[in-house]
């Protein structure tokens, strides 16, 4: 005689839904340390005038900026690959893995551009690293106001200039497509 218990489900749909609501928060924190590192190293080179010294020794500007871009490109490829591998297990099993990878990769590249903007505005290492970290956190919390269906579409679109807002909207849309 079989026992009167519900059939075992390997993935609880409610747990997956709660995880996807919190997943942009985890992604934001995953990229927080590389953002801090990028901003502090860029500001350190700006403050120490090492670029001017390298220019006097014959280094071209294109080589200098290309080295920074390639270094962070490799870092973002590794991070996007790891996040894609983790998402592919249970979170987005039906989605295209390349789409998830590209989403995380472009989010990382937008953070690189964000770090360049912060470093160009603020003069010291400490102020630029602190400001980048705070703005990174604050822009994520804008999502709580924008998740309201009554918020205007134009506001959502204009605040998507911040990398965290665009990343969170992309992940929510990806989950909506995954659920349907």
Task: Label every PLM stretch briefly.
Residues 1-44, 50, 61-62, 66-180:
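Membrane-spanning alpha-helical segments of multipass transporters and channels
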Residues 49-56:
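Short cytoplasmic-facing helical segments at TM-TM junctions of multi-pass membrane proteins
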């Amino acid at each position: 005689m079989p026992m009167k218990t519900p059939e075992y489900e390997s993935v609880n749909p409610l747990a997956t839904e709660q995880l996807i609501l919190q997943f942009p928060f985890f992604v934001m924190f995953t990229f927080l340390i590389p953002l801090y590192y990028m901003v502090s190293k860029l500001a350190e080179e700006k403050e120490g005038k090492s670029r001017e010294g390298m220019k006097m020794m014959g280094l071209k500007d294109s080589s200098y900026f290309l080295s920074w871009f390639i270094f962070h490109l490799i870092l973002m490829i590794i991070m996007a690959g790891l996040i894609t591998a983790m998402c592919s297990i249970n979170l987005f099993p039906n989605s295209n893995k390349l789409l998830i990878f590209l989403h995380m990769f472009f989010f990382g590249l937008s953070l690189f551009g964000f770090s360049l903007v912060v470093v160009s505005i603020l003069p010291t290492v400490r102020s630029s690293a602190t400001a980048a970290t705070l703005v990174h956190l604050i822009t994520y919390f804008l999502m709580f106001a924008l998740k309201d269906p009554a918020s205007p579409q134009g506001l959502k679109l204009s605040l998507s200039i911040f990398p965290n807002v665009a990343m969170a909207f992309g992940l929510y849309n990806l989950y909506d497509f995954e659920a349907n």
